[in-house]
Amino acid sequence: ADRGPSAPLVIVFHGYGSEKSQMLPEARALLGLGLSVLLVDFRGSGGSSGDYTTIGVREADDVAAAVSTAKACLPHAKLVLYGQSMGAAAILRAVHERQVAPDAVILEAAFDSLLATVRNRFAAMHVPAFPSAELLVFWGGWQYGFNGFAHNPAEYATSLKCPALFLHGRGDRRVSVAE
């Protein structure tokens, strides 16, 4: 929803296993604050083409494409990127690798590295993480053409040059506060 050329635009990116309609409560809250909102489905999610995700690696290209389109349509609008989990990782990677330069970011339940988050998922299921987590990260990266061990949103965050709001809760069963 466009609230006019002077309203900041918030581009909202969903998490893994989700799609943009699940971000409607957040979008409604942002609209209630007078902001313009654009909801995006990552490749392989919701109404987008593709049949797999890369937990933020290739999705960073989707972030960059959404930002490019938004800047072309609303060149004077302040730009805020909001991402949940994988969406937060994709935003951080886009800033780091694609030189995306938002005016601010909101990062909810961001994980620090792909390997750490996979290990934590195994632990949450009460399954030994080693060597399964390492094999999963290796295999997933190999299968989809990237180095999963190098996917480190915490490292990408060092490239942020804008205000950042990190949201996280102790009750999150998927991403630990330590991450």
Give the ranges of each region predicted by the language model.
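The serine-hydrolase catalytic nucleophile loop
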Residues: 16-29
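Alpha/beta-hydrolase fold nucleophile elbow
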Residues: 74-85
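Alpha/beta-hydrolase active-site loop
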Residues: 22, 53-74
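Conserved alpha/beta-hydrolase
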Residues: 27-49
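Short beta-strand element of the alpha/beta-hydrolase
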Residues: 7-15
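Conserved alpha/beta-hydrolase "acid-adjacent" motif
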Residues: 173-179
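Hydrolase active-site cap/lid region
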Residues: 93-149, 155-156, 162
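Short beta-strand/loop motif that positions the catalytic acidic residue
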Residues: 159-161, 166-168, 172
